[in-house]
Amino acid sequence: SFFVLHLCVCHKQDKNMNSKELQLLVRCGETSTVQFKERFSNQDSIAAEMVAMSNARGGMILFGIKDKTGEVVGLSYQEIQQINSMLANVATNLLRPVIYIQTETVIIEDRSILVAHIDEGDNKPYKDLSGVIWTKQGADKRKVMENSEIVRLFQCSGMMYADEQPIPFTSDKDINSSV
């Protein structure tokens, strides 16, 4: 239906999601803004995902959902508390600049799912502690390697403007003041 398509493609991150919305997102599968994680298993992988989302359009990581099948497995209360703590640690200590995330727990199929909301960043480019800049490519993440992409991220953040950049091999004598 239109509602399902609209939600899958254009879900706004209003940070409050009900179980019906979450079920529809899970049915739509992973996208560039929605990622599934059964558990918090590797902090470097989660850090890379958070960096990629911050450098792109933002997104959500849904914990308690199998990433290959979309099966809802859920989390215990203790797992939710532990993952919340680990997410805060990653966002504060493993990313540069620091990002701020919001989390919420949503119940679907009588199972608790932790939803971590990651906003598009204002201070791009974001990177992990190794200095790697990640971005989204469809549902996957990839390293940013090209200088032009890095420049674009700076420009998107408003930290660099083309008309303020030096032009190599020029001087003030090259300026045409009659224009």
Predicted regions mapped to residue ranges:
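Conserved N-terminal catalytic/coupling substructures associated with nucleotide/phosphate chemistry
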Residues: 2-179
